[in-house]
Amino acid sequence: MPGEQMDPTGSQLDSDFSQQDTPCLIIEDSQPESQVLEEDAGSHFSVLSRHLPNLQMHKENPVLDIVSNPEQSAVEQGDSNSSFNEHLKEKKASDPVESSHLGTSGSISQVIERLPQPNRTSSALAVTVEAASLPEEEKEEEELEEEKEGVGANAPGADSLAAEDSASSQLGFGVLELSQSQDVEEHTVPYDVNQEHLQLVTTNSGSSPLSDVDASTAIKCEEQPTEDIAMIEQPSKDIPVTVQPGKGIHVVEEQNLPLVRSEDRPSSPQVSVAAVETKEQVPARELLEEGPQVQPSSEPEVSSTQEDLFDQSSKTASDGCSTPSREEGGCSPVSTPATTLQLLQLSGQKPLVQESLSTNSSDLVAPSPDAFRSTPFIVPSSPTEQGGRKDEPMDMSVIPVGGEPFQKLHDDEAMETEKPLLPSQPAVSPQASTPVSRSTPVFTPGSLPIPSQPEFSHDIFIPSPSLEEPSDDVKKGGGLHSSSLTVECSKTSESEPKNFTDDLGLSMTGDSCKLMLSTSEYSQSSKMESLGSPRTEEDRENTQIDDTEPLSPVSNSKLPADSENVLVTPSQDDQVEMSQNVDKAKEDETEDRGDCKGREDAVAEDVCIDLTCDSGSQAVPSPATRSEALSSVLDQEEAMDTKEHHPEEGFSGSEVEEVPETPCGSHREEPKEEPMESIPLHLSLTETQSEALCLQKEAPKEECPEAMEVETSVISIDSPQKLQVLDQELEHKDPDTWEEATSEDSSVVIVDVKEPSPRADVSCEPLEEVEKCSDSQSWEGVAPEEEPCAENRLDTPEEKRIECDGDSKAETTEKDAVTEDSPQPPLPSVRDEPVRPDQETQQPQVQEKESPVTVDAEVADDKQLGPEGACQQLEKAPACASQSFCESSSETPFHFTLPKEGDIIPPLTGATPPLIGHLKLEPKRHSTPIGISNYPESTIATSDVTSESMVEINDPLLGNEKGDSESAPEMDGKLSLKMKLVSPETEASEESLQFSLEKPTTAERKNGSTAIAEPVASLQKPVPVFGCIYEAQQEKEAQSEAPPSAPDRANLLHFPSAQEEDKERPDVTPKLRQSEQPVKPVGPVMDDAAPEDSASPVSQQRASQEQRASQEPFSPAEDVMETDLLEGLAANQDRPSKMLMDRPTQSNIGIQTVDHSLCAPETVSAATQTVKSVCEQGTSTAEQNSGKQDATVQTERGSGEKPASAPVDDTESLHSQGEEEFEMPQPPHGHVLHRHMRTIREVRTLVTRVITDVYYVDGTEVERKVTEETEEPIVECQECETEVSPSQTGGSSGDLGDISSFSSKASSSHHTSSGTSLSAIHSSGSSGRGAGPLKGKASGTEAADFALPSSRGGPGKLSPRKGISQTGAPVCEEDGDAGLGIRQGGKAPVTPRGRGRRGRPPSRTTGTRETVVSGPLGVEDISPSMSPDDKSFTRIMPRVPDSTKRTDASSSTLRRSDSPEIPFQAATGSSDGLDSSSSGNSFVGLRVVAKWSSNGYFYSGKITRDVGAGKYKLLFDDGYECDVLGKDILLCDPIPLDTEVTALSEDEYFSAGVVKGHRKESGELYYSIEKEGQRKWYKRMAVILSLEQGNRLREQYGLGPYEAVTPLTKAADISLDNLVEGKRKRRSNISSPVTPTAASSSSTTPTRKATESPRASTGVPSGKRKLPTSEEERSPAKRGRKSATVKPGTVGAAEFVSPCETGDNIGEPSVLEEPRGPLPLNKTLFLGYAFLLTMATTSDKLASRSKLLDGPTGSSEEEEEFLEIPPFNKQYTECQLRAGAGYILEDFNEAQCNTAYQCLLIADQHCRTRKYFLCLASGIPCVSHVWVHDSCHANQLQNYRNYLLPAGYSLEEQRILDWQPRENPFQNLKVLLVSDQQQNFLELWSEILMTGGAASVKQHHSSAHNKDIALGVFDVVVTDPSCPASVLKCAEALQLPVVSQEWVIQCLIVGERIGFKQHPKYKHDYVSH
């Protein structure tokens, strides 16, 4: 290859040409093929990179600027150098390569600086220009090096420029100009115009200098004629010129760069071709005057597409990549559609590279076919033409404004176009690509016209590829825009192996924009962990492989494609912006692309193919030939490119790796700069770069502005569908095709992606796929390097690429989870887009578009099949399949899409082997093929079990499509729903289910979207995971390591579940589900009941959505609405569901459980009920998989609700969950749900069983029976009988939204497991709602995902003592209401956790209090180890148990899943107030306001039992339960008017107010609270009373004279449930006015408080229960009772108390009276923990009390709180710990402490005992004994961090300091201990100092006067008053500090070494008294 590259005209061209003969490359042989291919590869990526930036940085469109402001253009041209220098400098700052390039090429660098003004352009152009200025060979080498160094720094651009020299710079400029002209076309966008102008100027300036300097150097050296062409056609030709001088390695580099140039040029040429024919006259004119208008006139559809692509590219990439985009000028048109169709953009860029190749050597001009778009450039780019072009670039500078150079370009382009057959077809294409042509004037006329025409021809013909060579032409001409993009991509690809690496960053001037975009996207891909990038790369690579037959092109192609994908995927954060920006860009494009629409339509189609054709353009000629020839060519070229470009490839790989870094910045910038456009791109790219491009193009076709976006989204959706079709087709495809596809994995994926966007891209996609085959192979050689660099370089190019793809895929899947969110914003676009594309009429394929994308793709494929033959389609299918695998996330949708019936399935038959091959490769690529595996396994599964495999793929779609198809769902809102429904249950019969789903989707959403498309959409619908995305990402990462096949299967099961469910419900929901069940069992029958539910939640969640989708899809409006709602609500609700699905997908087991979920949905009602039971059972699962549990509950709820009001409930499953939950009376629509919840709570301590029977009708509690039995209770179980009315599954509890149905009998059956699962929590019901299903699925992480936000009581907050009741409330907590009564607000979505769904049917939904007994196993562990969210979740579970009582009915009612809110209670009526009718006591069942003893606040609740001794068991509305003294119970409900209360506002802060009114809604009481003159309604739970406020009501409303019943001492009010230390809590509250919520976060009443919305709000943070620091108190300060008793609170350090341990606590008077707390039911509760127990000495307590009183933080409240703290009985605590398998350390033993899983010191307060100090020194957490109490009470391990004791009282700060992890405060300290051994001073402090890290401690007995001490070796002397004077004198002489033990103590308390004289007590002779 190097040699050939050296000989542009020589062997490379010939060999490459011969290799590429089959692909339409021959048609464009004006460029040597080998060189073209190689250059194309780099160029392709470069251009793509630039293109992406263009797409993303639409706003900075120099071309637009030029068009808008010709004067400005001139000025900018004048300023080009300075502007470029500025940009270069900017770029320099970011990209060393650029800066070096700048230095190298003065003029070029100036131009680059100009171009750099747009963000992307700057980086790409800067590099390119700089590179151009370098001598050809020098530059190439430099660029290679720079590529390597500047990958991060726009290395691709640099490489391209460097390698291409002037060609490169010109290419960059050409592209820039082209891009500018395209932007000009889009100049409607003023800012774009300015940017475009700037870019145009830059291009001109760069073109001129480049053409003069670099172009002359590079072009003269390499190929003066080509150079001219390169200059004119996007300095791509310059690159070829560079290639010629830079022979050998340089040639390789150059070819890569030239490819980039070519790509840039081809982009321009595409424009040029169009311009030559249509745009030649209009281009400059239109670019400047009527950019958009000319486009339409030239070729409305294609032009529009290209322009839109370019516009978007310009706008998008204009800022950062505008220059690159401009460089891609010709490509840019394609690029413009690429905004919508990012792949297209890549295509556009590739042509530049290819052009560059052509330019590289005169021969290379012929091989332009490699860069088909570039070919036109190549042909006109004859050696003479190159010279002309060289000059032309300068003219271009002027002409872009004038438009004359554009015509020049057009002429050149026409010539070139005529040269290759494609060009003549592109003649038409150029029209389509006229926008590009317009852009071309901005470019150098030469470079622009030549590549543009062939490329345009290609693009134009793409839509209707009927000839094989014409097919290439179609690719070039028919898909000219595509060609433009493809050429860019191809060239980028070819140049990009080296150039892309460079180009990715900077190298690609023309490519820069695209490449920058590509780079950005690529970098984003990198950011996405190459997830999107590889996938995108795969897509683009696949798309571009054909374009870029040379490995380099392929690699570059892939990289740019990936880059675009990356842009789409990586900028998930940006993606939202991008999505919005894309919308804006699309709007802009709409203006500018009104014209472009038609063109873009064609372009979209073309582009997709073009991308494939870019590298495949050479191979495109005949589908089969192309496949084989391309395969061989690609293989050869891969080898050649690999060899030739190995420096480059090493570069490429290196650069590619770096590229992600540089592009990351660029990309990130890009997405941000062009977020709107970027988003569609992101989505598209995420799904598949080619798809993205296609989408963008298609969208412009239909509706340039919106259509593009829509297309992108649609493609995303379509992609999945098509992917399915492709997968199926691939399965059916010949093994050869499969192999091809395998080698073309990315290309296949792209095809898949594109196929989803077949409407515009369908015809393109087949070409693409054929090309992708070639590209795939090329890519394997080159792209793999780049991609591997980006991802993980594979050793072999193919392996590399595949592995990269795999990595990309896996990462994409993981990232997609992340990206899911970002794609989400585009989702709306997608939703709109489907309409737009449908509306727009992608003329030949409008119907197809509207019709299932798969069908569209099929038609397109068929179209292409004619010209390209089935082989092309087969290639496409394999490519798609491969790509599918590569892009697990984004491609999954495609896989789903592809398999649609009647679509491309037949052609894709041969794709099956690629799927398998890709699967094989995928694992390589990604160690954890979770996302990847999904694809590969999906593919394999597809082969083996189509439906399952489809499902599998669909699941990846979940992951991938979450990001990609998520937008697709917006486009295809209905499709999304359909798809999703299908996926969970279509595991077995996924296809049919998918189809069923899709058909409705097709009819409703996409018109043409088949079931697969719908399923994709459906699957994506859950994708809305803005909040869940993070969880998804985290959990994916956590679970993504699940077995690949399992994840796939899970995905399959799961996703199909959604579709199946959708189908099943509409068709034969029960039957289908049942039938599916057997298949699903694959997933996990782990918990047939629970797993079903487990899966059920997700599947049901999805299913409900999907059902709704399938139901609604029947009515497009409804479905759309639902889709939108689902998008929004599902975003929250589906977020968890999707997350669950995704994660399960990654965790094969989990997904399979989801399948079970499908199984659970066997009977919808059963499923719903199952979900309910799952909820109950889910508790146990919840523990393990709280997240899933939540999802399950929500899913179940959604499913159940869905039947009633599928659109509303499911759509707003979150809404429903949140709202319905708290409006539990509301039955699901149409459901008459009779549910009987029997909650049996067995209180071990009381040995009294209170059986509460709550009867619900439609979720409304109609009857409550409380039976009290005095048996020895063993556990709390909940039995739920639910009659679900015929209404769909489980409308059992309307208010639950069918969640009750979930908890119905299934719930009851699951209650046991739930209990087990929640063992500690006891709140199976509430948490169970989500947990049950989780259990089945491997969704431990998911549980975490859905874990309650800590806010509710969160893990730590959740005082286990109330853990049970917490379970119910925590569920609410998990909803976002946690802090407030809001919880109930039905704001499941509020829960950012992705638990939105779950919030609605939170465990309490299931009402599975039953499992209150459930052990703390999963949840318990989660609590301590999991994130706060998980803990919150855990909390939810615990709360459920207690809640079970109070929310017994509530559970059916969804139990205020948001939080234990009054509304829920109100809704539940007596349900909330657990045994409303008490057995025996007249007060039982009364609603009261009672004091939570731990924090002194009064909360609303109900008396459930008369415990005796003046105490009553109270169930608080927030689910907490405890015994309260009668004196602390106020019989005032509602709270009387004009009473001062404390209300928790939505901001989660409590503030005082006055009750001014009451009102009841749905049984929930609301207070009108007046605060500061403003009145606001608060839920009952949000209104509490401070101690003072409550005391005011005691006299009148106190519950009798019970206050005397128990001692008033601190322990008096304390109940086991009130164990949390009030002080800590209160202090917490003090710190933030949050109040009990915060307090709840603190262990004091964390659960309860957290549960209570007020407390919950603060609870969200799950603030630690910090006994010590008053500052930390969040709950409102509780004033009032001060106790003389010493509080465990802060211990004053006033006097040093000997650290010796006191044997016992100072017994507290009420210790005996106070319940100590139960022994843990869970016999392994504390397993793995080692405990040290110590008690505060009397002096500690006195000191603490004095400090509290006197200290700054001292307050009566704190003391009061402490009084409320449960008494500490050391012996009993030891019993509790031992009963829970805890290990008690009798003495501090560091070795033993280290061997334990966790060593804790249990104490009643911070103290000054030896153990306490040793633990402070060693960093062992000191935990309050309340933690033990709470953990035992909840039977679940609480988060000890919420119970941490303070380190102690700081003398210096005069306050109690919190415990902080500390290590070695005495690090390396050499200490001399001197004492007379009083209080064992020497040994004690020696041990403490050594434990604290002291280097050495020497003990010196004061009485040992005869011993001499060498004080000089010590750092400090620690002594006591017994220190001998001699030692003191010696120390004074040595200036050795002499301190007392207090200094050591203070160091321990502060956690670091402190000053020796900071306090008088540090004096050794200080006497405390």
Curated annotation (Swiss-Prot):
Q: Name one GO biological process term.
A: double-strand break repair via nonhomologous end joining
Question: Which Pfam family, giving just one, matches this sequence?
Answer: BRCT_3
Q: Name one GO molecular function term.
A: damaged DNA binding
Which intervals of the chain are annotated as region Tudor-like?
1481-1600
Going by the UniProt record, its keywords in alphabetical order are: Activator, Centromere, Chromosome, DNA damage, DNA repair, DNA-binding, Isopeptide bond, Kinetochore, Methylation, Nucleus, Phosphoprotein, Repeat, Transcription, Transcription regulation, Ubl conjugation
Motif position, UDR: 1601-1628
Q: Which residues carry this modification: Omega-N-methylarginine?
A: 1329, 1352
Here the cross-link named Glycyl lysine isopeptide (Lys-Gly) (interchain with G-Cter in SUMO1) sits at 220, 1431, 1560
Which SMART domains does this UniProt record tie to the protein?
BRCT
PROSITE patterns linked: BRCT (PS50172)
Q: Where is this region: Disordered?
A: 1-24, 67-168, 254-337, 352-599, 614-707, 754-870, 927-1017, 1034-1144, 1178-1231, 1267-1478, 1624-1715
Could you tell me where the Acidic residues compositional bias lies? 135-148, 1269-1282
Keyword Ubl conjugation attached:
yes
Q: Which residues carry this modification: Phosphothreonine?
A: 305, 543, 548, 662, 912, 1211, 1606, 1635, 1645
Where is each BRCT domain found? Answer: 1749-1845, 1861-1961
Residue spans of biased composition, Low complexity class:
158-168, 1099-1112, 1295-1326, 1469-1478, 1631-1648
Q: Where are the transmembrane segments?
A: none
SUPFAM superfamilies associated with the record: BRCT domain, Tudor/PWWP/MBT
Interaction with dimethylated histone H4: annotated segments:
1492-1520
Cross-link Glycyl lysine isopeptide (Lys-Gly) (interchain with G-Cter in ubiquitin) lies at: 1682
Sequence motif GAR, location on chain: 1393-1400
Q: Which residues does this entry mark as bearing Phosphoserine? A: 30, 68, 73, 109, 169, 179, 181, 267-268, 297, 368, 382, 397, 429, 452, 464, 507, 518, 523, 525, 552, 579, 622, 627, 631-632, 684, 716, 719, 763, 822, 965, 1018, 1075, 1096, 1115, 1213, 1216, 1314, 1339, 1359, 1365, 1423, 1427, 1457, 1459, 1470-1471, 1615, 1628, 1632, 1653, 1670, 1675, 1698, 1756
Which location does the Swiss-Prot or TrEMBL entry give for the cross-link Glycyl lysine isopeptide (Lys-Gly) (interchain with G-Cter in SUMO2)?
Answer: 220, 920, 974, 1362, 1431, 1560
Assembly notes: Homoligomer. Interacts with p53/TP53 (via the central domain). Interacts with DCLRE1C. Interacts with histone H2AX and this requires phosphorylation of H2AX on 'Ser-139'. Interacts with histone H4 that has been dimethylated at 'Lys-20' (H4K20me2). Has low affinity for histone H4 containing monomethylated 'Lys-20' (H4K20me1). Does not bind histone H4 containing unmethylated or trimethylated 'Lys-20' (H4K20me3). Has low affinity for histone H3 that has been dimethylated on 'Lys-79'. Has very low affinity for histone H3 that has been monomethylated on 'Lys-79' (in vitro).
The record comments on the domains as follows: The Tudor-like region mediates binding to histone H4 dimethylated at 'Lys-20' (H4K20me2). Interaction with NUDT16L1/TIRR masks the Tudor-like domain and prevents recruitment to chromatin.
Q: State the protein's name.
A: TP53-binding protein 1
Q: Which organism is it from?
A: Mus musculus (Mouse)
